[in-house]
């Protein structure tokens, strides 16, 4: 602030600069003092904000440990071969291990056409019907193959997709139909004009793969005195030592996958089946010489009311397949005394001509029904020619039990665990559901680190250290993890809140929570140092720093081998009401939440600083204004003095000149 006042030759003589500074000294001191107070308030607020952030972080970690999503409540799913099987866990999963073999993964129907030139093929017009399981997709074609693909994709969203893929440089393409649903119940069936189109471009074969032989005709044509057959209740009865022959029609295509399935049962000769009917005679009635006789009453009890038979089985080689090259007797079949469905592979011989079913027992009667020869890969009797994959269920052995599912994502085998099948393998895969040891360790390390940072900030702002000649602080220097900027801020905050009893009481409370014993299932495991967390009570400065330290080996072993007690040490439900009542994390959260919550103690302190800083800024501005006013007044007075001195000097010179002239007269 320049005075603008200078008297040549008199500045030093009258000390006008010193006079000016002396006159403004008290006003300048008020500005400096109020500004320092403002800086101090802003630094104190910054210190409280830093403490608030550190405490909030520690409180959040305490809340995380006691929440439903606590790593103590979550399990980790680990597979011994993630290329075959992976697993993910949800809340509520248990610590368990299972052994699985993935025999087959679930797949969907993907059918390709033969090569064709889209420009030369004629697309049938009309209704194209596609079934994916029970979902029907109806598309009307106008003869344009590109529009057909577009309509299939629009109407088949989530169920069916179609595309045309260029297959060579000669302009040929292949039509691809892909079911978007896995599982054998979601077979892709093509009907309507779509069936004609599929046959035309080589998606489906012209030949059929399935047929149902007429059992009554077989009985009529093949029964004899030496081959006693009968047709009763839609079933073909093979008496002892009888057989039937099922000829394969010429229009039926038999493949290596072809099977015969039928329902079969047996009963011993001379024994009738238990009757499901009750027959009784209600008698007659006579009235005035008129007599009425009643007919027998028949009550059909139905199958549910039949006298149940004890289920028994016999074994028999009863299926033989024949071709021009010879015949082959198929393996034993288990036959029950109640109807059960059996399937037998019949595709072992090429050019199959007939299938024989024989009753080789001389004291058993065999009954068969619902006979069908089929290819399991057929679609409504037609065989896909260029199938990339077929709709199949996933098949696994789960702890030795055969299991089928229609998806590779299985949620219902292990509670709250999802198994994801990747590929089949004959190797056994071990699926472990176990505590998330790494997740627990990570959060506990974060918790310990956050606790130490809270303690460090309290130690810094509460410090009573003297720093003569800018001597370094032991409290700050022992915090080796601080960056240069953080260390600079720490020195600014050193001792700034040393009069705050709240922080001293908080430190004492935190240490009490951390180091006191807690109730766990193991009376020999109740304090934190038993899991490898301890404190070196004396800091490098000779004070009580009480920072937490780790015995890493003991810490890791406790988490890995004693996880239940570690959990109880941090969060414990005393009465089984699923609400945590005790433990380090629980008690720490209860202590810290009221401090940092909106309206809490520290929150309000920071808010109060906003008002103090606002008022102090006004005070600084007020002192500056008063200083400027005072400065202008002083400058005015000194300028007046300057003018007076100049006039006096001029008068002095005038008088000297007058005196000189008088003497020279």
UniProtKB/Swiss-Prot annotation:
Any one Gene Ontology BP term: bacterial-type flagellum-dependent cell motility
InterPro entries xrefs: FliD (IPR040026), FliD_C (IPR010809), FliD_N (IPR003481)
Coiled-coil ranges from the UniProt annotation: 602-658
Keyword hit for Membrane: no
Pfam families: FliD_C (PF07195), FliD_N (PF02465)
Primary localisation category: periplasm
Any single Gene Ontology cellular-component annotation: bacterial-type flagellum hook
Compartments it resides in: Periplasmic flagellum; Periplasm
Substitution effect: residue 126 to R: In strain: 212
Superkingdom as given in the UniProt entry: Bacteria
Annotated phenotype, changing residue 227 to D: In strain: 212
Keywords noted in UniProt: Bacterial flagellum, Coiled coil, Periplasm
Chaperone as UniProt keyword: no
NCBIfam families tied to this protein: PRK06664.1
Similarity field: Belongs to the FliD family.
Free-text function comment from the UniProt entry: Required for the morphogenesis and for the elongation of the flagellar filament by facilitating polymerization of the flagellin monomers at the tip of growing filament. Forms a capping structure, which prevents flagellin subunits (transported through the central channel of the flagellum) from leaking out without polymerization at the distal end.
Assembly and oligomerization: Homopentamer.
Name of the featured protein: Flagellar hook-associated protein 2
Source organism (scientific name): Borreliella burgdorferi (strain ATCC 35210 / DSM 4680 / CIP 102532 / B31)
Lineage: Bacteria, Pseudomonadati, Spirochaetota, Spirochaetia, Spirochaetales
């Amino acid at each position: 602030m320049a005075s603008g006042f200078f008297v040549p030759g008199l500045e030093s003589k009258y000390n006008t600069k010193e006079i000016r500074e002396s006159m403004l000294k008290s006003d300048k001191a008020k500005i400096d003092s109020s500004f320092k107070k403002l800086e101090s308030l802003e630094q104190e607020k910054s210190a409280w904000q830093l403490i608030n952030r550190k405490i909030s972080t520690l409180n959040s970690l305490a809340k995380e440990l006691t929440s439903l999503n606590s790593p103590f409540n979550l399990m980790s799913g680990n597979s011994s071969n993630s290329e075959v099987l992976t697993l993910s866990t949800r809340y509520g999963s248990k610590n368990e291990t299972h052994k699985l073999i993935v025999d087959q993964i679930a797949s969907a129907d993907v059918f390709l056409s033969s090569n064709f030139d889209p420009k030369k093929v004629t697309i049938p017009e009309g209704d194209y019907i596609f079934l994916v399981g029970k979902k029907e997709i109806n598309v009307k074609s106008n003869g344009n193959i590109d529009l057909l693909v577009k309509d299939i994709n629009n109407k088949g969203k989530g169920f069916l997709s179609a595309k045309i893929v260029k297959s060579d440089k000669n302009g040929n393409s292949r039509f691809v139909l892909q079911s978007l649903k896995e599982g054998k119940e979601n077979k892709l069936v093509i009907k309507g004009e779509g069936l004609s189109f599929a046959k035309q471009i080589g998606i489906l074969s012209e030949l059929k793969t399935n047929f149902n032989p007429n059992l009554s005709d077989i009985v009529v044509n093949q029964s004899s005195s030496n081959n006693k057959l009968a047709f009763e209740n839609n079933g073909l009865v093979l008496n002892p030592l009888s057989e039937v022959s099922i000829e394969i029609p010429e229009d039926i295509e038999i493949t290596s996958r072809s099977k015969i399935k039928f329902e079969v049962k047996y009963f011993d000769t001379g024994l009738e089946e238990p009757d499901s009917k009750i027959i009784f005679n209600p008698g007659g009635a006579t009235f005035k010489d008129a007599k009425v006789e009643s007919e027998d009453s028949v009550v059909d009890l139905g199958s549910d009311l039949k006298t149940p038979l004890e289920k028994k089985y016999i074994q028999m080689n009863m299926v033989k397949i024949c071709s021009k090259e010879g015949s082959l007797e198929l393996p034993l079949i288990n036959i029950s005394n109640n109807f059960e469905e059996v399937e037998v592979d019949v595709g072992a011989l090429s050019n199959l001509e007939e299938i024989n079913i024989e009753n080789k027992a001389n004291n058993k009667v065999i009954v068969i029904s619902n006979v069908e020869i089929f290819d399991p890969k057929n679609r409504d009797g037609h065989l896909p020619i260029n199938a990339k994959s077929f709709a199949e269920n996933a098949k696994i052995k789960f702890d030795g039990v055969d299991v089928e599912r229609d998806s590779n994502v299985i949620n219902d085998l292990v509670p709250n665990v999802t198994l994801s099948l990747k590929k089949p393998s004959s190797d056994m895969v071990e699926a472990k559901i176990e505590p998330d040891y790494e997740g627990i360790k990570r959060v506990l390390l974060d918790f310990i680190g956050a606790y130490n940072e809270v303690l460090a900030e309290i130690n810094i702002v509460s410090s009573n250290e003297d720093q003569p000649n800018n001597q370094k602080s032991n409290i700050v220097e022992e915090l080796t993890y601080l960056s240069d900027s953080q260390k600079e801020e720490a020195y600014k905050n050193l001792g700034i809140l040393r009069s705050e009893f709240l922080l001293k009481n908080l430190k004492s409370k935190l240490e009490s929570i951390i180091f006191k014993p807690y109730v766990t299932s193991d009376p020999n495991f109740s304090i934190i140092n038993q899991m490898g967390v301890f404190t070196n009570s004396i800091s490098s400065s000779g004070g009580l720093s009480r920072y937490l330290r780790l015995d890493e080996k003991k810490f890791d072993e406790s988490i890995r081998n004693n996880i239940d007690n570690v959990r109880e040490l941090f969060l414990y439900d005393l009465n089984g009401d699923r609400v945590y009542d005790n433990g380090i994390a629980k008690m720490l959260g209860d202590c810290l939440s009221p401090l940092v919550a909106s309206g809490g103690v520290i929150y309000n302190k920071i808010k109060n600083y906003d008002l103090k800083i606002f008022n102090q800024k006004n005070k600084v501005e007020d002192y500056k204004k008063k200083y400027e006013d005072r400065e202008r007044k002083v400058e005015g007075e000194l300028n007046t003095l300057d003018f007076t001195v100049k006039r006096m000097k001029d008068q002095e010179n005038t008088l000297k000149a007058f005196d000189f002239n008088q003497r020279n007269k």
